[in-house]
């Protein structure tokens, strides 16, 4: 299932949640390294996305050394971690992601297509598990929700 960012977000089955709960701790225990790898890969694939991060001072070839890049990578993975923590509280998860959508659309003016692209990089980095494809489709769709309203 490719990452989607329009329409009704998919629903995580109990099996999906179990798969995420079993594998996420292995990913998150090295969150600094893993989050930086995801963000750097995303910026490599979508160099224009760097324009959305005005605090990044490093040249494109030295992003891995920029403290602002490392901090943003951690912010992103911690938001994913928080979302995973809300998997059993669907209303709270939706509210959290819609609030992030509002912030990204009004305060940061992020191109909404980037949520889907970043989600796809996350999933490919995590081995493309179907449960993560569903999770990140939920994330991408709800982060885009304010833009489509």
From Swiss-Prot:
| Positions with a binding annotation for heme b | 104
The further comment given in this record reads: This globin is the main component in hagfish blood.
Entry protein name? Globin-3
UniProt xrefs under SUPFAM superfamilies? Globin-like (SSF46458)
Family label: Belongs to the globin family.
Quaternary structure, from the entry? Monomer.
Keywords (alphabetical) are:
Heme, Iron, Metal-binding, Oxygen transport, Transport
Read off the Gene3D superfamilies from this record.
Globins (1.10.490.10)
Tell me if Metal-binding is a UniProt keyword of this record: yes
**Would the keyword Iron turn up in this protein's UniProt record?**
yes
Give the Gene Ontology MF terms in alphabetical order. heme binding; iron ion binding; oxidoreductase activity; oxygen binding; oxygen carrier activity
Globin domain mapped to chain residues: 11-148
